[in-house]
């Protein structure tokens, strides 16, 4: 299957927010063949890299991240919004269009594995703020984020540039616009 079929499976919802084309992944994950292909692309990329954990960003990142962790036979680490993790956490604030928010990770998320190799997964990268905060969280508890992978990259919003100082970026489908 080519990447165009994956791109074609993503529904574009115009003006979901005024002036925004929302990339709806529910049509992708609802198509078993396409969903499997996305996970296979990611599995093939990471299966020979000695990755220790997959970390994923709430909520849509969990869909792809947990499936990938299962396919690789490694642990899955959720990165969640404030108040959603029940044990000791650390947080990282990030800027939104109209304010700030914060993400949390358990302080023991990587099971005391020194310098664990982690791949960060999310469904989409736009401006990169959420991903940047997530990479900082991963690093702050002693792991290394070897790459951040996204199903969709909205190139026009330049999120890759925000992540460049911290990690490499991989995406399956790219859209030039915003």
From Swiss-Prot:
It is found in: Cytoplasm. The keyword Glycosyltransferase applies. GO terms for biological process: adenine salvage; AMP salvage; purine ribonucleoside salvage. NCBIfam families: apt (TIGR01090), PRK02304.1-3 (NF002634), PRK02304.1-5 (NF002636). Belongs to the purine/pyrimidine phosphoribosyltransferase family. One of its GO terms (cellular component) is cytoplasm. This is Adenine phosphoribosyltransferase. Catalyzes a salvage reaction resulting in the formation of AMP, that is energically less costly than de novo synthesis. Keywords: Cytoplasm, Glycosyltransferase, Purine salvage, Transferase. It is an enzyme of class 2 (transferase). Pathway: Purine metabolism; AMP biosynthesis via salvage pathway; AMP from adenine: step 1/1. The keyword Cytoplasm applies. One of its GO terms (molecular function) is adenine phosphoribosyltransferase activity.
């Amino acid at each position: 299957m080519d990447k165009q079929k994956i791109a074609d499976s993503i529904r574009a919802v115009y003006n979901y927010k005024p002036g925004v084309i929302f990339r709806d992944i529910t049509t992708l994950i609802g198509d078993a063949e396409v969903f499997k292909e996305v996970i296979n692309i990611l599995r093939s990329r990471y299966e020979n890299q000695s990755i220790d954990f997959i970390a994923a960003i709430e909520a849509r990142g969990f869909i792809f991240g947990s499936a990938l962790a299962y396919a690789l036979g490694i642990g899955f680490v959720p990165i969640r919004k404030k108040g959603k993790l029940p044990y000791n956490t650390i947080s990282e604030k990030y800027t939104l269009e109209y304010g700030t928010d914060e993400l949390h990770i358990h302080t023991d998320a990587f099971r005391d594995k020194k310098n664990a190799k982690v791949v960060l997964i999310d469904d989409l990268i736009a401006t990169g703020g959420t991903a940047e905060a997530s990479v900082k969280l991963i690093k702050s508890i002693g792991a290394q984020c070897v790459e951040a992978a996204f199903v969709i990259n909205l190139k026009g919003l330049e999120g890759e540039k925000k992540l460049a100082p911290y990690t490499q970026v991989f995406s399956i489908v790219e859209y030039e616009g915003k």
